[in-house]
Amino acid sequence: DIKNDPHLLDSLDVIINVGDADTAHTGGIWWEDPEISSAIRKFVWNGGGFIGVGEPSGHPYQGHIFQLASVLGVEEENGFTLNYDKYNWEEHPDHFILQDADQPVDFGEGKKNIYALEGTEVLVQRNKEVQMAAHDFGKGRAVYISGVPYSFANSRTLYRAILWSAHSEEELHTWFSSNYNVEVHAYVKNGK
């Protein structure tokens, strides 16, 4: 779609890329196309949001697994950097995304061997494997989540991740319930 319409991303606030590496869901070999990877980098750099779940932009190419590692602020260890020290493990549990989390976040199976790059805020790590991270990229923001099985609590966490990545934290309490077990739907045009 991006190749057919270079202005496609202009109407978006946040892109969500979910799935395992080298699948149609995450893009697979399409990440080798510089038009596509550059368009998404430009979108985030100029203020857009990007949320990656699982192995987002995952395709082994040019020494990386995550082709958007610089955007996400995380990379998957594949043996190329085993001898590099990785010091960024400090968690930031008070981050906006986690403020409703009253229990440990459920990442399901999650992913192994994910590490944070310098400048990334690690929100949750388990056994020195990043499960959730937030990263500024230019004027934009990216969030990495290792897995998001459906639950009311995870729905709220994902909602907060979307708002944060879109620079829309102030919209949190628009059509909002303090109880994350309740979802609020508003049909403004219908007056309901």
What is each model feature region?
Residues S11-L12, G47:
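A general structural motif
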Residues D1-N4:
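Short acidic loop-to-helix transition motifs that present clustered carboxylates
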Residues D22-G110, L117, N127, N154-Y159:
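A glycine-rich, often tryptophan-bearing local segment used as a flexible ligand/cofactor-contacting loop or short
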Residues D13-T23, I51, A142-Y144:
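Structural motif
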Residues H7-L8, G19, Q67, L72-N78, ...:
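Extracellular ligand-binding/catalytic regions of CAZymes and related secreted enzymes
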